[in-house]
Amino acid sequence: MGAARIAPGLALLLCCPVLSSAYALVDADDVMTKEEQIFLLHRAQAQCEKRLKEVLQRPADIMESDKGWASAPTSGKPRKEKASGKLYPESGEDTGSRHQGRPCLPEWDHILCWPLGAPGEVVAMPCPDYIYDFNHKGHAYRRCDRNGSWELVPGHNRTWANYSECVKFLTNETREREVFDRLGMIYTVGYSVSLASLTVAVLILAYFRRLHCTRNYIHMHLFLSFMLRAVSIFVKDAVLYSGATLDEAERLTEEELRAIAQAPLPPVAATSYVGCRVAVTFFLYFLATNYYWILVEGLYLHSLIFMAFFSEKKYLWGFTVFGWGLPAIFVAVWVSVRATLANTGCWDLSSGNKKWIIQVPILASIVLNFILFINIVRVLATKLRETNAGRCDTRQQYRKLLKSTLVLMPLFGVHYIVFMATPYTEVSGTLWQVQMHYEMLFNSFQGFFVAIIYCFCNGEVQAEIKKSWSRWTLALDFKRKARSGSSSYSYGPMVSHTSVTNVGPRTGLGLPLSPRLLPAATTNGHPQLPCHTKPETPALQTTPPVVAAPKDDGFLNGSCSGLDEEASAPERPSVLLQEEWETVM
């Protein structure tokens, strides 16, 4: 079995869930603030009061026969209708018996809209879904006495209601809080580590001119998109969580929820939500640009492999516009639609189908990048089979293919597709916890992995750092010896007994000499320096040594110094393609 047979199987295994789950959510980050919770409560109150007005205006005989407001007794087996959330008795039960006497009138208790209550029965209503932290599988209960009045709490002038099933998440939240605290710690540490490592990587690639080429420019854009994504997440969290949010709401009791709901709806000022809306907008934009620069990396590598003639400088501008400009278009469309049709809160909650304006382009980039990844892995497997034809060691082929695949996975964001087919479920579910831990871990540390693989582990980067370190240590050693006035000075590990005063301006002072390049041979008692000529001339003739970059398995393999120079059309793609093969082989 050849190594090339792995690619079709891998494509069949992974493409099916990707293509069949384009409806899945991407980086759902709904944050419920206290102000938004109050808004939802008041909206539910307005809807309830409208319905109450319609019902109370009907004649008494219509009210008593209206099953839409009738509630079932606890003695019968209830049947819940999901559309309306009301309970009806099973067929065969005497529905007329529960209307004997005066029914309890429907009302709004600042939490729930209660229907007509049958005298002497307990009314059960599903916990409202507009209370974010309620247990939406539970029920709230009220009792209607035989006089047609809602039962009061003994010794208190208020209506009795049992919300214990609804508030169980509020009173028994230790496990859930531990999960959220752990997830918050994971992504905070991950994005912090990624931000620090990516900052160093960008500074390295920008500082060394020999590393300036199209490939590294694209890497720098990708690194910058990861950095801006991390910063935008920190800013968004600081803005949204600066006031009273769910941390406070989770500790609220039923009475405190009532007090919040009874408060008048605060006036919505145009400037009250500007800060959080700007933070959410920039977060969504930088999130989208990060996905699209990952796609740009895939398109660039795919173009080098499959395009015979590829102008890097020309396509660099196109990639730049694609990576930064295209996300700005659909994010601007989303902002316009949200401001026009759903201008409520901080825009952090998904407003129906409007979320697809941003999520569909992101999902498309993930699917397209995964297809490019599968195609490149297929070509790698084919090349491995051709180069190792006639050899019996298939395990080495598999190891090379696995290594190449693992190197490409962070660059192509392959981990995004693992849970694409899995919808978000209950917080207490095991699958949800596994999914969130996986996503928080890999999404936050992806920038760190990319910086390690494509910068710090790159041979050319390491060579440039070693050269710079050698220059700095050599210059420092000369300065130290010059200040001390010693009769000896060192070139790296070797010591010359020539007086410092005999070192002229042409003796190579401060040249980028690497200690490992200095041979131990001596001439006339002096060490033989690189490019040193025998003294037919009175002064040493030295030239800066050229340090060859070691062969590297990283994506940055090969010197950038010759990549952007003019070359003939047939020669240029072959050189680039060979470098990319050495990247992943």
Swiss-Prot record:
Q: Where in the cell is it found?
A: Cell membrane
Region Disordered: start-end pairs? 66-100
Give the GO cellular component terms, alphabetically.
plasma membrane
User: Any ranges marked Extracellular in the topology annotation, and which?
Assistant: 27-184, 236-277, 338-356, 424-435
Q: Which GO terms describe its molecular function?
A: parathyroid hormone receptor activity; peptide hormone binding; protein homodimerization activity
Q: Which PROSITE patterns match?
A: G_PROTEIN_RECEP_F2_1, G_PROTEIN_RECEP_F2_2, G_PROTEIN_RECEP_F2_3, G_PROTEIN_RECEP_F2_4
Q: Which SMART domains does the record associate with it?
A: HormR
Which stretch is the leader sequence? 1-26
What keywords sit in the KW lines?
Cell membrane, Disulfide bond, G-protein coupled receptor, Glycoprotein, Membrane, Phosphoprotein, Receptor, Signal, Transducer, Transmembrane, Transmembrane helix
- Which pairs of Cys residues are joined through disulfide bonds in the record? C48-C113, C104-C144, C127-C166
Motif (Important for interaction with G proteins) on chain = 469-472
Q: How does the protein associate with the membrane?
A: Multi-pass membrane protein
Post-translational modification, as annotated: N-glycosylated.
Gene Ontology biological process: adenylate cyclase-activating G protein-coupled receptor signaling pathway; adenylate cyclase-modulating G protein-coupled receptor signaling pathway; cell surface receptor signaling pathway
> Which ranges sit in the Cytoplasmic compartment?
209-215, 302-315, 378-404, 459-585
Superkingdom to which the source organism belongs: Eukaryota
Q: Does the keyword Amino-acid biosynthesis apply?
A: no
Residues annotated with Phosphothreonine modification: T543
Residues annotated as glycosylated are: N147, N157, N162, N172
User: Which parts of the chain span the membrane according to its record?
Assistant: 185-208, 216-235, 278-301, 316-337, 357-377, 405-423, 436-458
Record note on quaternary structure? Homodimer in the absence of bound ligand. Peptide hormone binding leads to dissociation of the homodimer.
Q: What does this protein do?
A: G-protein-coupled receptor for parathyroid hormone (PTH) and for parathyroid hormone-related peptide (PTHLH). Ligand binding causes a conformation change that triggers signaling via guanine nucleotide-binding proteins (G proteins) and modulates the activity of downstream effectors, such as adenylate cyclase (cAMP). PTH1R is coupled to G(s) G alpha proteins and mediates activation of adenylate cyclase activity. PTHLH dissociates from PTH1R more rapidly than PTH; as consequence, the cAMP response induced by PTHLH decays faster than the response induced by PTH.
Family listed = Belongs to the G-protein coupled receptor 2 family.
Q: Which named protein is this?
A: Parathyroid hormone/parathyroid hormone-related peptide receptor
UniProt gene name: PTH1R
